[in-house]
Amino acid sequence: IMAGLVGSEMCIRDRAWGQKVSGKISDKDYENVISKSCPGPGACGGMYTANTMASAIEAMGLSLPYNSSNPAISIDKSEEKLKISSSIINLIKNDIKPLDILTKKSIENAVKLITVLGGSTNAVLHILAICKTANIDFSIDDFQRISNCTPFLADLKPSGKFLMEDLH
C-alpha cells in the first residue's frame, strides 16, 4: 500500500490509536487518520509480516526479482504480469515445482534478507513451516547463527522511518 497522508504527515494507525486513547487527538481526527491510512491495494507499507515474507520468498527464488518491493499500484507492478505469466508457463512446461527450487541455501538467503531488512518475527514461524514442508533441516538455531553474522541495514517502519515502497 502506498503511504496514506494526513496533510504532509504519513498516517500510522497504531500511533493514532495511542494518541486517541491518551486524549491527544479527537475521535474525528482519529477517524480521519483511519480513513486515509490504507489508500489502496497491497500490503501495509512497513516491514510487517506480508512484506517480510514477500521479501523472503523473493530471496528463496520463488518470485521474480523486485516483485516484493514493488507497490501494488505502480506501473512496474502492472508490467510484471507479462513476466510472471511467461515464467509460470516456463515452470509448467519444464515441470519445475517449488520443492525443486527450495534448498537449504535458498532458505539461508531468505533469513539473511529478513535480518538485513529487520523483518517481522513472524517470519521465524513461517520459514520453519516452509522448511518442515520441504524436508529441509533448519531450526531456530540456524536463524540465530545467520543473524549473528548478518548486519541489520534497513530503517523501515514500524521501527524505522522508511516504507517498502522506498526500498523499491
Which sequence ranges carry the predicted segments?
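Accessory "access/gating" subregions that flank catalytic or transport cores
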Residues: 39-48, 55-58, 62-120, 125-166
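Conserved thiamine diphosphate
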Residues: 13-40, 59
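Short, amphipathic alpha-helical segments
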Residues: 24-27, 46-50
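Single conserved hydrophobic/aromatic residue that forms the stacking wall/gate
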Residues: 1-7, 11-12
